[in-house]
Amino acid sequence: MIIYLHGFDSTSPGNHEKVLQLQFIDPDVRFISYSTLHPRHDMQHLLKEVDKAVQQGGDKHSLICGVGLGGFWAERIGFLCGIRQVIFNPNLSPEQHMQGKIDRPEEYRDIATKCVEDFREKNRDRCLVVLSRHDEVLDSQLSAELLHKYYEIVWDEQQTHKFKNLSPHLQRIKAFKTLP
């Protein structure tokens, strides 16, 4: 089973396309939607829904994927639910990047500090990071600097922030999903 979390643009038709692409790895792809506007509520909602999907799914190699803001959530929720994560162009500092887009972006800071101390150290090698060299929204070099100590970084030379085409990375994701 693969759980897919959209980014800030939850209504983008690209989300459906990504789900279809991920079905080449596993036919059981679950799209879990969340508001993007209420971080504390989103955290509770995503924890509940992902945990329920994992319990019902019966796949010992479940995986959670997210793009942009979905990458922020996939890394944390996947860690808390004990499943591997694949994050594309993750928004690692939504409290900064969401200024002016949502009412209380500072809630992201609260979530980041309250998650689990040193969670990336505890999550070491359980997350695969795919970064675009052409991300027009986030500084992918900074993301690589923050994450390379903990996770494998895969660079993409073609995609932009929304990462419309996952195809070149599907075999790598499939191999990562099936690791013991």
From Swiss-Prot:
Matching InterPro entries: AB_hydrolase_fold, UPF0227, UPF0227/Esterase_YqiA
Any single Pfam family the record assigns to this protein: UPF0227
Domain of life: Bacteria
Gene3D superfamilies, A to Z: alpha/beta hydrolase
Protein family membership: Belongs to the UPF0227 family.
NCBIfam families: PRK04940.1
Protein name: UPF0227 protein Spro_1925
